[in-house]
Swiss-Prot record:
Subcellular location(s) per record: Peroxisome membrane
GO annotation terms (biological process): peroxisome inheritance
UniProt biased composition (Low complexity): 30-39
Function: Required for peroxisome inheritance.
Keywords linked to the UniProt accession: Membrane, Peroxisome, Phosphoprotein
Miscellaneous comment text of the record: Present with 639 molecules/cell in log phase SD medium.
Stored InterPro entries: Inp1
Protein name: Inheritance of peroxisomes protein 1
Subunit structure: Interacts with PEX25, PEX30 and VPS1.
């Protein structure tokens, strides 16, 4: 019985499998076919999208590559032209000490205070000082160090030209009247491996020293710095060939920068040049500045004294109304007489002028000194007497217990006037 039951189970499983293997209905087949078609469409869309992305990436890559090729083409349009070459050149870094010492203002003040009697003596001293300063201002070109030795080349770099024609010379490209739009820069290269490269701008100054050898000086914005370029002969080279190469060099630099000549006779020493540009005029043609300052100061002093005399004449000529004749100011009159008697007028006119100015100043101080209403000798008579200069300002009478205090104050003021 147990076996029959197991067999029946196996048979039932086989029957179910056979039933599953039976053909499906038309509806189910249509449904499955639709599913399959949808899956195929999705796959096709995904493949198309991937293809589109690949195409866009390729297009971007192609665009970047085309841009790179375009930039490369622009770089190719930048060309280098050699204008001049020579094989043996020596370059020295030179220094020109230029000292223009201006006299200090303190010296000018001291010189202005010298009197007219000492002008001749002091002028000789100052003249010698200016000669010593001029001797110190001699200009010497000192080569300090060797910068490079080897070949020299002047080349030109042209950028921004769309079409560079072979029949156009490089100088025509650098000219302003050129029909091509672009940028041209000239360079000076010195040394075997281009040890020194310097741009040759239109305002660069190159000067030739006419004399023994072929020397050229390149000046910079700093007037104390120079480059000395000397052309040396090559091996088995004649003098005429060297002169021809030098002429070609001058022809090139005269077209691209400022070129000039100077003579060796105008220099000082063997390695000293360019003194014409900084040479000071001779001392014999120029009067010493210190003597001029002294003379001008003396004239100005005389004019100032006359002007002061004119301004202070009213103090000397005006009569002092309350002066020293007053009985109440007897002490002041005595001091005034002593002051006038103490002055001794020397023969020197400058001292006389100074004394007259001092007198006028003292008279002005006496007039502006405060005059108190409290009298010293006669209080009842002079109680209402006031100074004419201060008549517009009313004075307040002091009480009698302050008389001693005012007397002491007035004595101090009188003693102060006596010290003058």
């Amino acid at each position: 019985m147990v076996l029959s039951r197991g067999e029946t189970k196996k048979n039932s499983v086989r029957l179910t499998a056979k039933q599953e293997k039976k053909p499906q209905s038309t509806f189910q087949t249509l449904k499955q076919s639709l599913k399959l078609s949808n899956n195929k469409k999705l796959k096709q869309d995904s493949t198309q999208h991937s293809n589109d992305t690949n195409k866009s990436v390729k297009a971007k890559k192609n665009g970047t590559s085309s841009k790179k090729t375009g930039t490369q083409r622009k770089r190719i349009s930048t060309q280098r032209f050699s204008l001049f070459t020579y094989g043996n050149v020596q370059v020295m870094n030179s220094f020109v000490p230029i000292h223009n010492d201006i006299p200090n203002s303190s010296c000018i003040r001291r010189n202005s205070q010298v009197s007219a009697n000492n002008v001749t003596e002091s002028s000789g001293v100052f003249f010698n000082d200016t000669q010593s300063q001029d001797s110190q201002n001699t200009i010497k070109l000192k080569p300090t160090s060797l910068m490079a030795k080897g070949p020299i080349e002047i080349y030109q770099i042209c950028t921004g030209f769309d079409k560079l024609k072979e029949n156009i010379a490089p100088f025509q490209k650098s000219s302003k009247a050129s029909s091509h739009d672009g940028h041209v820069v000239n360079y000076l290269s010195i040394g075997r491996h281009g040890d020194i490269v310097h741009p040759v701008l239109p305002k660069l100054q190159i000067t030739r020293l006419n004399g023994a050898g072929f020397k050229y000086f390149i000046s910079f914005y700093n007037p104390e710095r120079y480059w000395e370029i000397e052309f040396l002969p090559l091996i088995s080279q004649s003098q005429s060939e060297l002169e021809n190469s030098v002429k070609a060099f001058e022809n090139v630099i005269s077209k691209i920068c400022q070129f000039s000549h100077i003579n060796e006779g105008a220099t000082i020493g063997n390695n000293e040049s360019l003194s014409d540009k900084f040479k000071l005029p001779p001392t014999s043609d120029i009067e010493p500045p210190n003597t001029e300052i002294i003379n001008n100061d003396d004239d100005n002093d005389d004019d100032d004294d006359n002007y002061d005399d004119d301004d202070l004449n009213y103090l000397l000529d005006e009569e002092y109304e309350q002066g020293c004749t007053d009985n109440s100011f007897s002490v002041i009159s005595n001091t005034c007489s002593n002051l006038n008697a103490s002055f001794l007028y020397p023969s020197d006119p400058t001292d006389a002028v100074s004394i007259s100015i001092n007198e006028a100043f003292k008279n002005a101080i006496r007039r502006t000194a405060p005059v108190l209403n409290i009298p010293i000798a006669a209080p009842s008579i002079h109680s209402k007497q006031q100074n004419k200069r201060y008549s517009s300002y009313p004075f307040i009478d002091s009480p009698p217990y302050l008389q001693d205090r005012h007397r002491r104050f007035q004595r101090r003021s009188i003693s102060g006037l006596g010290d003058l």
